[in-house]
Amino acid sequence: MPNKRNVELLATLKENLERAQGSFFLVNYQGLPAKETHALRQALKQNGARLFVAKNTLIRLALKELGLPELDGLQGPSAVVFYEDPVAAAKTLVQFAKSNPKGIPQVKSGLLQGQILTAKDVEALAELPTMDELRAELVGVLQAPMAELVGVLGGVARELVGILEAYAEKKAA
């Protein structure tokens, strides 16, 4: 007979997996002190991600019940990272691990839009620009022609003013 807490955790885990459309990272957090775990949660939260600690059996059961593939790495302590932007979450995890002398949290694997990711895939994902960075680049690309047009039109107006001033001076003389 499953206990009430596990039933609630399973329901929450399934709800989060459905909301994330089956996209998440699986990480090992073992050896991370409570203070640093809290700091990791805060860093992830700032980037629209969330750390959810659950037993491997519950993670396996939730994946199975939702028809998602079982991932490698469901051994030892595991936490699931749900995210809005996979690149921002991957960057946060990789940077946090680099700043930790033990290299924790360790990414085990992940699932992104139905594709199984290895730890190396997640590290490669962290090298990509985030959605906000891509949006900023797009705005810059779109603004450049407009800025050039404004400069050209401003130059034409300055030349016209110069011609009119020269004409006025010539008439006055």
Curated annotation (Swiss-Prot):
The gene is rplJ. Belongs to the universal ribosomal protein uL10 family. One of its GO terms (cellular component) is ribosome. Part of the 50S ribosomal subunit. Forms part of the ribosomal stalk which helps the ribosome interact with GTP-bound translation factors. Forms a heptameric L10(L12)2(L12)2(L12)2 complex, where L10 forms an elongated spine to which 3 L12 dimers bind in a sequential fashion. This is Large ribosomal subunit protein uL10. The N-terminus is blocked. GO terms for molecular function: large ribosomal subunit rRNA binding. Forms part of the ribosomal stalk, playing a central role in the interaction of the ribosome with GTP-bound translation factors.
